Amino acid sequence: MNYECMTQDGRARRGRIIFDNGQIVQTPVFMPVGTQATVKGLSPEELDALGAEIILGNTFHLMLRPGAEIIQAHGGLHQFMHWQKPILTDSGGFQVFSLAKIRKLTEEGARFRSPIDGREVFLTPEKSIAVQHALNSNIIMQLDECTPYPATYDEAANSMRMSLRWARRSQQAHGDHANHLFGIVQGGIYPDLRQESAQALVELDLPGYAIGGLAVGEPKDAREATLDAVLPFVPKNKPRYLMGVGKPADLVEGVRRGIDMFDCVMPSRNARNAYLFTRFGILKLRNSRYKEDLRPIDETCNCYTCQRYSRSYLHHLDKCNEILGARLNTIHNLYYYVHLMHEMRRAIEEHRFDDFARAFYAEQECGND
């Protein structure tokens, strides 16, 4: 796997990730989240049609159900879910973080009870890598401890240094396997800890680097200051992945600072709650004002949903709890995110990213009438 930066506008990077099989992902890119080997409600063909180039799978959930062995028997996650474009799998670290009240964390790994059937599970860096090898995703992640917010300096330091030790164990377990292992920078909101983490991971010479431990409750300005502090220490010739950060404005600010890859459940989860993203801000479809509104969600949008259906119809589907409503909303929200990344790539190519960002914020403030 190679990363090629084709042009920059300030710190914003327009590049591409070239995989060993010849597949190419244009960056900056948003990765829809397919937690259970599916992006909820959509077929792989629908994902492809709306422009998704790479998706994310969840190691934690797939390990527990159906199990890595079943997916491996299909030939891997691509064949299991019939998605032929690249897949990135996370390590399970964030899900372990979310089980804070019922898990025990040690140097060896994380011990917890399965939220599915209650059986005890022991997840180590080596086990996470083995599961991801069985899933056979294109990009795999080291197991890390997602540092909570708030955390004291000492708590963040101890957590970050254990994640570094786990990164070394992950690399050793990975060996020369064909998948591409990314390291995860931790350190809370402490700039010196983030820099220490990044510099130590760079010594491992991994194919890519993720910024983890953000979008866990910290203020927006603290998140952006953390990115400003750490990104100069992350190699320019490798892809940079900001994990779990997903509001549209967060994507713009991440790209502005040199991030190449994003993922978040927000567009698909919000779609199922009739909370829709548009060029002019949020549209809350459950509002009664949309009962008789004949316009599409966004008159500037070319997605399948906006080209065919009215706000009134989608409002009706939501009121009736019809599955089609959630599906059409998800198509729109994911198209919005994918198209936003396309617009940012073009703005970087044309060296007008700052103008794009100003227009983005101005339009978002207009609101939907």
UniProtKB/Swiss-Prot annotation:
The note on the cofactor says: Binds 1 zinc ion per subunit.
The text of the family note is: Belongs to the queuine tRNA-ribosyltransferase family.
Instruction: Provide the residue span(s) of the region labelled RNA binding.
Output: 244-250
Q: Which cofactor does it need?
A: Zn(2+)
Which gene is this protein's source?
tgt
Q: Which residues bind substrate?
A: D90, S91, G92, G93, F94, D144, Q186, G213
Query: What task does this protein carry out?
Result: Catalyzes the base-exchange of a guanine (G) residue with the queuine precursor 7-aminomethyl-7-deazaguanine (PreQ1) at position 34 (anticodon wobble position) in tRNAs with GU(N) anticodons (tRNA-Asp, -Asn, -His and -Tyr). Catalysis occurs through a double-displacement mechanism. The nucleophile active site attacks the C1' of nucleotide 34 to detach the guanine base from the RNA, forming a covalent enzyme-RNA intermediate. The proton acceptor active site deprotonates the incoming PreQ1, allowing a nucleophilic attack on the C1' of the ribose to form the product.
One GO BP annotation is: tRNA wobble guanine modification
Signal peptide limits: none
Q: Which residues bind Zn(2+)?
A: C301, C303, C306, H332
Give the species. Answer: Dichelobacter nodosus (strain VCS1703A)
As recorded in UniProt, its EC number(s) are 2.4.2.29
User: Is the keyword Transferase in the record?
Assistant: yes
A GO CC annotation recorded here is: cytosol
Q: Does the keyword Acyltransferase apply?
A: no
* Subunit composition and interactions: Homodimer. Within each dimer, one monomer is responsible for RNA recognition and catalysis, while the other monomer binds to the replacement base PreQ1.
Record GO terms (molecular function): metal ion binding; tRNA-guanosine(34) queuine transglycosylase activity
The positions flagged as active site in the entry are D90 (proton acceptor), D263 (nucleophile)
Q: Quote the pathway field.
A: tRNA modification; tRNA-queuosine biosynthesis
Which keywords annotate this record?
Answer: Glycosyltransferase, Metal-binding, Queuosine biosynthesis, Transferase, tRNA processing, Zinc
Name used for this protein in its record: Queuine tRNA-ribosyltransferase
Q: Which InterPro entries match?
A: ArchSynthase1/Queuine_TRR, TGT, TGT-like_sf, tRNA_ribo_trans-like
Kindly state which reaction or reactions the protein catalyses. Answer: 7-aminomethyl-7-carbaguanine + guanosine(34) in tRNA = 7-aminomethyl-7-carbaguanosine(34) in tRNA + guanine
